[in-house]
Amino acid sequence: MKINGNEIRPGNVIEHEGGLWVAVKTNAVKPGKGGAYNQVELKNLINGTKLNERFRAAETVERVRLEQKDFSFLYEQGEALIFMDTETYEQLELQKDFVGDRAAFLQDGMMVTVELYEEKPIGIRLPDQVTLAITEADPVVKGQTAASSYKPAVLENGIRIPVPPFITSGERVIVDTNELTYISRA
């Protein structure tokens, strides 16, 4: 579907320079001289590179509709991650590097959303929050109560995050998978 350059909004996926790009930020600019344009920060969906482009209102770009399907994580097999389509029960195999660092957050039966373009997976979205156990937490140092302080802790999946001083080993916490930050106790 063709849209004008000034209609691009954050989250839109467009076809540009032979690739698929998602608009991260947009800024409508109206200079004193010359025509108005839309300054757009784009991120490539395949390799993650970023690009800043200007689109004039008269320019048209192809907006792409991505199909989003729900999958359930089944298991890990070497460097492959196996998911199952919840509607057709077909299995989908994705490489760990496709999911990236967030593959460590995958748990058996976890529901994820896979974005498909022409039946080919191009992106995956994990839940925003997961509940994990703390395996290691440094002891509290007395006298650090004057300012808000955090101490490092290791989650059951091996990822290190800062947590408040009252969290101890063995506790379950809710973690933000996008920012890798502590949210609350479970």
Curated annotation (Swiss-Prot):
It is found in: Cytoplasm. One of its GO terms (cellular component) is cytoplasm. Its main location: cytoplasm. The keyword Protein biosynthesis applies. It comes from the Bacteria. Keywords: Cytoplasm, Elongation factor, Protein biosynthesis. GO terms for biological process: peptide biosynthetic process. Pathway: Protein biosynthesis; polypeptide chain elongation. Pfam families: EFP, EFP_N, Elong-fact-P_C. The keyword Cytoplasm applies. Signal peptide: none annotated. One of its GO terms (molecular function) is translation elongation factor activity. Belongs to the elongation factor P family. NCBIfam families: efp, PRK00529.1. Involved in peptide bond synthesis. Stimulates efficient translation and peptide-bond synthesis on native or reconstituted 70S ribosomes in vitro. Probably functions indirectly by altering the affinity of the ribosome for aminoacyl-tRNA, thus increasing their reactivity as acceptors for peptidyl transferase. This is Elongation factor P. It comes from Brucella ovis (strain ATCC 25840 / 63/290 / NCTC 10512).
